[in-house]
C-alpha cells in the first residue's frame, strides 16, 4: 500500500504556481498524493496531474465562527479518513486549522510552510491587537504536535513565531523561497526604449500597490520618462484589497497601465527594466526570484 501525502493549500492556483513540483516529486517517489483546496479553475489542472482533489469549505479571510468551526471539523474528518503519513500545510489558514486537527487525528508527521504572516501582523488598533492575540494563540495550538517541522522563508517570521511561543527553534527550518524553473525564466537583453517598471502581485494595499502608484505620479510630475505597469487581479476576499473604483481611476488617469492577471509573466518580465514589490510583509517573494532570473 502506498504511503499517503495530503497537502492542504488555500488556493488551487497558488498550489499550481508554488507547490506543484513538491507534489510531483512525492508522486514519483511512490506517494499517493491528495490535494485539498477551495474551489477554483485550477482544480482541473490539479486533477489532470493525477492527484486526488478534496474541496475545502474555506473562505480565506472569513471571520464567521460557525464557518471556521465547520472548516476545522471538515479537515479533522478528512485526516481521519485518509490517515496521511505526511501532512503538508501551506499558508495561514491551512497551517492553523490543519495543525490543530492533526493533533486530534492519526497523522504520522506534519510539515507546515509559513510563507508570510499576513496582514494580521501589520494591522494597528485595539481590534487588530485583539485579533492578533487570538491568531497567536491558535498558532501555539496548531504547531504543538511533536512530529512537526515548520518551514520559514525568512528569519523574521521564524523569530516572530518563536517569540510568541508557538514553536521552538529546533522545529524550524529556513528555506529561502519556493524556487524557480530555470527552463522557463532565462536572462534577456535589455531594451533601449523607455524604462518599464513592473509590479506583479495580488492587488492589495499591503503589497505596496498604493506606493507604486504614488511613485509613478511623482516621476510623472518630475517629467522622468518611465512606464509603470501593474500586473495582477483584485482580491475581494482580502480586507486589504484595492477597490475596483481605485483601479478604474488609475486607468483613466493614465499614470499606470493595468494589465490584469497574466499567465505569461516570463514574457512580461522580459519587457521590463525594473521589477518592484514594495510589500510590507513577505516570506521570500517568488515573483522577485523570477524577475532576478529573467532580468
Residue ranges and their predicted role:
Residues 37-41, 200, 227-242, 258:
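Glycosyltransferase donor-sugar binding loop
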Residues 89-95, 114:
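Short His-centered aromatic/hydrophobic patch
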Residues 15-18, 66-73, 108-111, 119-142, ...:
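Nucleotide-sugar donor phosphate/pyrophosphate-binding loop at the beta->alpha transition
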Residues 29, 33-70:
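Conserved nucleotide-sugar phosphate-binding/catalytic loop shared by glycosyltransferases and other
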Residues 261, 280:
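Aromatic "clamp/platform" in nucleotide-sugar-dependent glycosyltransferases that forms part
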Residues 54-57, 132-187, 196:
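Donor nucleotide-sugar binding/catalytic pocket of nucleotide-sugar-dependent glycosyltransferases
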Amino acid at each position: 500500500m502506498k504511503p499517503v501525502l495530503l497537502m492542504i493549500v488555500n488556493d488551487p492556483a497558488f498550489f499550481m504556481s508554488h507547490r506543484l513540483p513538491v507534489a510531483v516529486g512525492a508522486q514519483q517517489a511512490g506517494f499517493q498524493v491528495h490535494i485539498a483546496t477551495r474551489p477554483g479553475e485550477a482544480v482541473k489542472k490539479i486533477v489532470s496531474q493525477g492527484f486526488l482533489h478534496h474541496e475545502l469549505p474555506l473562505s480565506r479571510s472569513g471571520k464567521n465562527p460557525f464557518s471556521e468551526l465547520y472548516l476545522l471539523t471538515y479537515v479533522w474528518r478528512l485526516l481521519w479518513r485518509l490517515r496521511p503519513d505526511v501532512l503538508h500545510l501551506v499558508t495561514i489558514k491551512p497551517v492553523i486549522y490543519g495543525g490543530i486537527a492533526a493533533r486530534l487525528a492519526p497523522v504520522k508527521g506534519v510539515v507546515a510552510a509559513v510563507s508570510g504572516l499576513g496582514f494580521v501582523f501589520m494591522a494597528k488598533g485595539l481590534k487588530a491587537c485583539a485579533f492578533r492575540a487570538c491568531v497567536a494563540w491558535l498558532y501555539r495550538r496548531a504547531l504543538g504536535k511533536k512530529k512537526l517541522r515548520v518551514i520559514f522563508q525568512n528569519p523574521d517570521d521564524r523569530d516572530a513565531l518563536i517569540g510568541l511561543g508557538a514553536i521552538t527553534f529546533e522545529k524550524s527550518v529556513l528555506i529561502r523561497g519556493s524556487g524557480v524553473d530555470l527552463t522557463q525564466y532565462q536572462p534577456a537583453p535589455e531594451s533601449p526604449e523607455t524604462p518599464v517598471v513592473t509590479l506583479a502581485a495580488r492587488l492589495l494595499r499591503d503589497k505596496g500597490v498604493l506606493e507604486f502608484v504614488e511613485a509613478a505620479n511623482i516621476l510623472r510630475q518630475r517629467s522622468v520618462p518611465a512606464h509603470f505597469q501593474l500586473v495582477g487581479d483584485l482580491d475581494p476576499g482580502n480586507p486589504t484589497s484595492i477597490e475596483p473604483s481605485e483601479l478604474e481611476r488609475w486607468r483613466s488617469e493614465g499614470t499606470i497601465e493595468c494589465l490584469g492577471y497574466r499567465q505569461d509573466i516570463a514574457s512580461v518580465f522580459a519587457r521590463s527594466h525594473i521589477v518592484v514589490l514594495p510589500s510590507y510583509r513577505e516570506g521570500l517573494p517568488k515573483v522577485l526570484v523570477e524577475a532576478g532570473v529573467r532580468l
